[in-house]
Amino acid sequence: MTASEQTALLGSPRKPAYTIFSNSQKLLIILTATLASVFSPLSANIYYPALKSIQKELNVSEEILNMTITSYMIFQGLSPTFIGSLSDTIGRRPVYIICFLIYIAANVGLTFQTTFIGLLLLRCLQSSGSSSTVNLAYGVTADVVTSAERGRYVGLASVGPIIGPTLGPVLGGIISQYYGWRFIFVVLTGMALIMLIFIIVFLPETCRNIVGNGSLEPLSVWNKPLSSFLCKKKENEDLDETLEAQQAIEAARKKGGKPKPWKSLTLLFTYPTGCVILFNGFTFATYYAVTTSLTWCFSSTYHFNEVEIGLSYIPIGVGSMIAAFTNGFLLDWNYRRAVKKVLGRPLARGEHFDHDTGVALGFHIERTRLQIVIPAVVLAMLAMVAYGWSVYLVLTPAVPLVLLFLFGWLGTAAYSGMNVLIVDLNLKSPATATAANNLIRCMLGALGAMVIMPIINAVGMGWTFIMISGVWIVLSPLIILVAWSKSSE
């Protein structure tokens, strides 16, 4: 962790607050970022129930139409690679505005297009606009919260990408059935307009390269919420920064420099971040393989109709949402326990702990986070294998549905825990690091979605998920090495 998160050690001078935002302000900021991050996965999944209708109207084959899904995921991985670095340089607000303007324009075009080529290109544009909102949410979270509270707040930020796949198929099916598939994009346009207006009016700039801990006035009008022009900013009487601290923040602002989109790619080859990103990407790919195969498996094995299949996504979605909330508190509890062990006292509320100082005392952020992640991975693996065999043996539907709930809970706990660690390891450029994570996540997820059904058709559900577990085990030394080697921050 960088020196921006300082610990109030005995006898040390008073340090500036990590952020001037109150707890309620931080919660509102992160909730806004979370809602914005819903659009990328929602746009991907709301589209699925309408595929048959679109295929009939555009008169294309299923294989050709599936190109719109593959291309969406490719741009979902590539776009944040460039946008993440841009947001670390020019700020979160301008990038949010750019992304939503692109997204709204794409949805308007999708509403009126009449050709497959138009659909394909506009889906790529739609993905480019919405996909960066996910890593922006993690970037905003890292801007305003410290490591001691990052677990629960990053858990909250991860709710958006979880809600989208859960609600998308249900909402898309209802809209497509009663209003036609084009109205899906009308609804998305309206939702995006409301979100954009809220961001323009209320969301403050949080990027630490622009506003430091929030106390600096942004230089650009695009970094200022409209509300700041309507009411005078309240002075923070508790803020007593020294001249040295203020100069450090100003220097951080000037160091923003030019965007470096290639930095996301270099992180993939950086230890330990690269190891965590690769293992995390496969964890997500496994999750995506399970959800992608769910429709076919339940329709062929249990003869579920479209409504029943849509409802079958609810258990894994609910499990994922529970993990997003509960795992954050567990991560924070374990963090405070580890810090107390090396300091000999508990962290005071709002106290910031310097990880660089902690290393000399025997504290390792990688090990602290992965102590929660590794057990979750093992249990998720067992739940996934049990789910595969329960469907293969045609047990009562309640059994695989319960196992889907457990897999959603445990898999998301592992995934979100590694997301927190990736942010911890890259506090100077959290959005860039999350973009690298997103790139691998989407590419491996697309690969998992592409190969899962051919493998199931070849060897069956049970053996398919045993094979996936085998790959998971082969990759496990990556994460074990990070957890029990010397800290490399």
Curated annotation (Swiss-Prot):
Biotech applications: Phomoidrides A and B (also known as CP-225,917 and CP-263,114) are potent inhibitors of Ras farnesyltransferase and squalene synthase. CP-225,917 and CP-263,114 inhibit Ras farnesyl transferase from rat brain with IC(50) values of 6 uM and 20 uoM, respectively. CP-225,917 inhibits squalene synthase with an IC(50) value of 43 uM and CP-263,114 with an IC(50) of 160 uM.
Glycosylation, residue list: 59, 213
Subcellular location: Membrane
Transmembrane segments: 27-47, 64-84, 97-117, 155-175, 183-203, 265-285, 311-331, 370-390, 391-411, 442-462, 463-483
Matches recorded under PROSITE patterns: MFS
Keywords: Glycoprotein, Membrane, Transmembrane, Transmembrane helix, Transport
Family named by the database record: Belongs to the major facilitator superfamily. CAR1 family.
Function: MFS-type transporter; part of the gene cluster that mediates the biosynthesis of the antihypercholesterolemic agents phomoidrides which are dimeric anhydrides.
Protein name, per record: MFS-type transporter phiL
Gene name in the database record: tstL
